[in-house]
Amino acid sequence: MLDLKEYGIVMWDAEKIASFRRTLLDWYDREKRDLPWRRTRNPYYIWVSEIMLQQTQVQTVIPYYERFLDWFPTVKDLAEAPEEKLLKAWEGLGYYSRVRNMQKAAQQIMDDFDGQFPDTYENIAKLKGIGPYTAGAISSIAFGLPEPAVDGNVMRVMARLFEVNYDIGDAKNRKIFQAIMDILIDPNRPGDFNQALMELGATVCLPNGVALCEQCPVQGCCKGYR
C-alpha cells in the first residue's frame, strides 16, 4: 500500500474522515442533479452512461443515453447490434471507438460471463474499453463495492483538500489520489460517495480559478480554502 507520508500528505484521523463522509453525503442528498443514470443500479445502464460521459457534457448525453437504451435495452441487444445501427445511435457524440469497444465488451460478457454483467472490480476491468475509473464507478454504484472512481474532478478535489502538490494531469500521479480515496471512501455508500465527489468537482470545486469555495460543504477541512 502506498505510504502517503512519503508524498507529504497527512491523512485525517478516523473521526474527521467519518465527519467528512457525513457532510459530503448530506450535501449530495440535498443538492445532487436529477440525472437518469442516478435512478438505477443496473450495471449495464451505468456503464452506458459512464462511457458516454467521457469527453461529452452531461446535458448533451441525456437524450443519447435514453435513445441508446431504447434501441439496445440489454447487453445481448448491444452485443448483437448491426454496426450501422450502433453507429447511428452514437452519431453526434464522436469518438466512435467508444461504442465499438462497448460492443466488444458486450460480446465478452455474453461469451465469458454467460450474459451476466460481471460483479467484481477485477472482472469488470477486464472488459474492452473499461479502465480503472469506469470499473470503480460501476463496481461502487451498481454493486455497492468500496472501489474508488478516480477521475479528473475527483483528483482536483483531493488535490485541494490535502494540498497535494503533484500534477493531476500526469498519469503516474494517479496512484497518489487512488490511495487517498482508498482511505476516504464510505464503505456503506461507496457509489453515492464517488458520485458526490464527482458532483462536487463538476458543480462547486471548479477548475481554472473559478471554484465556488463559499458554496462548498467541506470547506472547513480543505487546505486549499482560503
Please identify what each model-predicted range represents:
Residues G8-E15, T23, W27-E214, V218-C221:
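Catalytic cores of DNA base-excision repair glycosylases
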Residues G224-Y225:
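Acidic, metal-coordinating catalytic segment for phosphate/diphosphate chemistry
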Residues M1-E6:
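N-terminal amphipathic/basic-hydrophobic helices that include classical n-h-c signal peptides
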